[in-house]
Amino acid sequence: MIIETNQACDLVIFGTKGDLARRKLLPALYKLEKSQKIHPDTRIIGTGRADWNTEDYIKIVKKAIKMFLNEKIDEKIWKKLRSRLNFFYIDVFQDLHFLELKNILNQKKNIIIYYCAVPSNTFNAIFTGLGKVNLNSFPSRIIIEKPLGVSLETSKKINNQIAKYFLESQIFRIDHYLGKESILNLLALRFSNSFFFHSWNNKIIDHIQITVSEEVGIENRWNYFDQMGQTRDMVQNHLLQILTIVSMDKPKNITPEGIRDEKLKILRSLKKIDLNEIHIKTARGQYASGIINGKKVPSYIEENGANKHSKTETFVSIKVDINNDRWFGVPFYLRTGKRLAYKYSEIVIVFKKISKNLFQEFNKNLSPNKLIIRLEPNESIKIYFLNKVPGLSKEYKLKSDKMEFNFNINNTKNFVDAYERLLFESMRGIQSLFVCREEVEEAWKWIDPIINGWKKTNINTVQLYKSGTWGPKSSDEIIMRDGRFWETFN
């Protein structure tokens, strides 16, 4: 068992030149330095095949932090972070390079954490190289980014490869959505407040929507994205994890095992979508050209390096049913896409209306109560409720009002970025916010039949939608068939 404490570490970043490292990891490490959460003896070792020395690497790191940090660099903090930085040239297909890396790591007795910020097709070379020189021994840890593979079969292959060299307790599969403050607060919201705890079921809740909307396109990731599509990249990866947190039963305790057990129960309770339902419960789209933030943007098949005949989806929405007592009859509507009208992610819990409302005589089409949990931007919680319109009228006119709690405004000093939190948790050896092998594979078991169903039926085509809109009409039809509507961004 890994000891859960903040110990001196050697953080080895494979792929330190890449987009993930520059945009997310390096700014997160700066913030951890700022909050004094990094052990004084911790080292950060960037690796790659770039023709750099450590001084070159230091300049690259500072440039990345300046570009992607949402605040001005404090030179005192930078000086501390800079002192930790080292660069090591490595070709992961060369065994000799791992021996040289071992010599560097043996200079200190720090716990080693490997962060694989690289494509999954290079994972096995890293696992094998580390294993050959015994750099995989306990209590070293390894962090890998989801999604793992493109199917259950390929995911199992990656998991089998890493299991040859690392114990499950050493493996930290990262899903950055699980590090968001609003997702973590969802556990507190649900299980520590009686009015939510007793209302979180099919007697009180009508339906739940989960939306992850992106303004960006594929961002020069054609080769990666075209083999993945939005379903593999986002639904299997992020939205199903959000769904499990929203819907799981109360865990026995707040341990990694306690939380994972309940999440697994949900994944195993997801109702499979049959071939005869697939056109009713799913919708796919691909972005056409359009206008985003006042600028014209190309269609998916006009992107650099694109296959003009590609049918890969950049948008997907799915109606999900959970086969258990708590959620029987409560649909979950998921949607996610690229080049949509706004960038935002949120969970919408819509409560059932009162069957015989006392004020219905004076009010037609009363809005339902809603709880909206905004994940990004500006993480917040909003509660919508009905309130009397002030005035002297004898009629009881009602309107929908809201109460809002904004994490950024109310907790400015304590607000923590997702990658900042997840890196810190990995340094402490706490796996609660990371995904176990069974979760990954159960998610693929549910997703694979949907993707295969699209191939088997005559709906293996995608509807085009204009960039800057909310996706194809078929997405609206999924929810409108049930007499419901997507909650619009505001």
Curated annotation (Swiss-Prot):
The keyword Isomerase does not apply. Substrate binds at residues 176, 180, 214, 233, 338, 343. It catalyses: D-glucose 6-phosphate + NADP(+) = 6-phospho-D-glucono-1,5-lactone + NADPH + H(+). Pathway: Carbohydrate degradation; pentose phosphate pathway; D-ribulose 5-phosphate from D-glucose 6-phosphate (oxidative stage): step 1/3. NADP(+) binds at residues 49, 91-92, 146. Its EC number is 1.1.1.49. Disulfide bonds: none annotated. GO terms for biological process: glucose metabolic process; pentose-phosphate shunt, oxidative branch. Pfam families: G6PD_C, G6PD_N. The active site is at residue 238. SUPFAM superfamilies: Glyceraldehyde-3-phosphate dehydrogenase-like, C-terminal domain, NAD(P)-binding Rossmann-fold domains. GO terms for cellular component: cytosol. InterPro entries: G6P_DH, G6P_DH_AS, G6P_DH_C, G6P_DH_NAD-bd, NAD(P)-bd_dom_sf. GO terms for molecular function: glucose-6-phosphate dehydrogenase activity; NADP binding. Keywords: Carbohydrate metabolism, Glucose metabolism, NADP, Oxidoreductase. It is an enzyme of class 1 (oxidoreductase). Catalyzes the oxidation of glucose 6-phosphate to 6-phosphogluconolactone. Belongs to the glucose-6-phosphate dehydrogenase family. This is Glucose-6-phosphate 1-dehydrogenase. It comes from Buchnera aphidicola subsp. Schizaphis graminum (strain Sg). The lineage of its organism: Bacteria, Pseudomonadati, Pseudomonadota, Gammaproteobacteria, Enterobacterales.
